[in-house]
A protein has these predicted regions:
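Conserved catalytic core of sirtuin-type NAD+-dependent deacylases
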Residues: 1-237
Length: 237
């Protein structure tokens, strides 16, 4: 039996799938991956992207931060791909219990997924740092320079920047889901960014599946490994 057939059988038998995904899930919708060869980290800016999207840079140079953010990190107008759609279908069928994602684009919800734990936040949520009022991603996209609320406060995206902590409630929910899963599918992530990558250590089962174009540090621990595009695999599931 080849690996794809084995994965199909595991999915058929499973009642508690958890999907843990990274940037590679959304690249097939056209959203660039930070760390791929042609991703953000290899492009040329006055500062390294990890400096620009840090909390201290946001505080120190908000105009530059928002210029970069609007241009490079605000993925509007993109649509869910086959992976997002299949996951939403599994949830509807009662097979998938949660999606844990490192992405900030909201495409899982756009595809219909309900239980999504966004480790790094979402560009779709933006709050005034003074009064707490909610603002849309379009508001931030269309604002000139630093987006300001009616009250005069800066509108900050609900995205976890470098030097900021992950939301503890989301971490706890993700850990709980992963530890109870009967099948854990990890896809489109290099598994090198912590603490997010460490979450798969909470999996207790023996059906750990890794799908990623490149090798990851966890390949040796997985029960099934695919070095393929996600779309190619999910189109056959």
């Amino acid at each position: 039996m080849d690996n794809l057939e084995k994965l199909k059988n595991w999915i058929a038998e499973s009642r508690n799938i958890v999907f843990f995904g990274g940037a590679g899930v959304s690249t097939e919708s056209g959203i660039p991956d930070f760390r791929s060869v042609d991703g953000l980290y290899s492009q040329k800016f006055d500062y390294p992207p990890e400096t620009i999207i840090s909390h201290s840079f946001y505080e120190r140079r908000p105009e530059y931060f928002f210029r970069f953010y609007r241009e490079k990190m605000l993925p509007l107008g993109f649509e869910p791909n086959i992976t997002h759609k299949v996951l939403a279908k599994w949830e509807e069928e009662g097979k998938l219990s949660a999606v844990v994602t490192q992405n900030i684009d909201g495409l899982h919800q756009k595809a219909g997924s309900k239980r999504v734990y966004e480790l790094h936040g979402s560009v779709l949520r933006n709050y005034c740092t003074r009064c707490g009022k909610f603002h849309s991603a379009e508001f931030v996209k269309e604002s000139v320079s630093v987006p300001k609320c009616d009250c005069g406060g800066i509108v900050k995206p609900d995205v976890v920047l470098y030097e900021e902590s992950l939301d503890q409630d989301i971490i706890e929910n993700a850990v709980s889901a992963i530890s109870r899963a009967d099948l854990l599918i990890v896809a489109g992530t290099s598994l090198t960014v912590y603490p997010a990558a460490g979450l798969i250590n909470y999996y207790r089962g023996n059906r750990l599946v890794l799908i990623n174009r490149d090798e990851t540090p966890y390949d040796g621990y997985a029960n099934l490994v695919f070095h393929e595009s996600l779309g190619k695999i999910f189109a056959n599931l």
